[in-house]
Amino acid sequence: MINVLFCFFSDEFIDAYINDLQIVKKSTNVSISADNAIIDLIFNYDLTNLRILTVSFNKDTDTLEDDKYIYVGWAEAFPFAILKETGEIVELDWEDPTYIISYMAKDQSSFLDILIEIEKLNQKDVFGSITEKEKKENLKQISIIASGDKYSWFLSNFDNEEI
């Protein structure tokens, strides 16, 4: 079915879309504990090309920390980080990193789970293989994975009213 859907898009679009989802394992492996899923991803995989909606990850050399945060990526022009105190993933104001714009996930694993589900939904949406009703249902399921309204930042990426 995907081949049929791809025929409606230019080769350039398809190549760019696929390129934005590439993750390549690095030749060296850094041992990271299982509860640090984002850190493991950043240090053990080349995420240079990975884009899911507006989300991208820092290179390992750009992953900085201070007493409050570990800065791990970007959502559009805003940095997102691991809040050390709680382990939550938060989106910060680029001008004032003490100001939390939104709470993105309760922990690192949940954040990655949310991104996977968002990308699956986005692909269905882009290729027109989902109805509005199914999209709403998918968004509800992602909200459940996200653990509720506190972590509903991703809803603004979809043309939805209320789920």
What positions do the PLM features span?
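Compact, glycine/acidic-enriched structural inserts
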Residues: 92-126
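Secondary-structure transition/turn motif
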Residues: 76, 85-86, 92-98, 140-144
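Mixed-charge (acidic/basic) macromolecular-recognition segments
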Residues: 113-163
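A surface-exposed partner-binding patch
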Residues: 1-86, 145-163
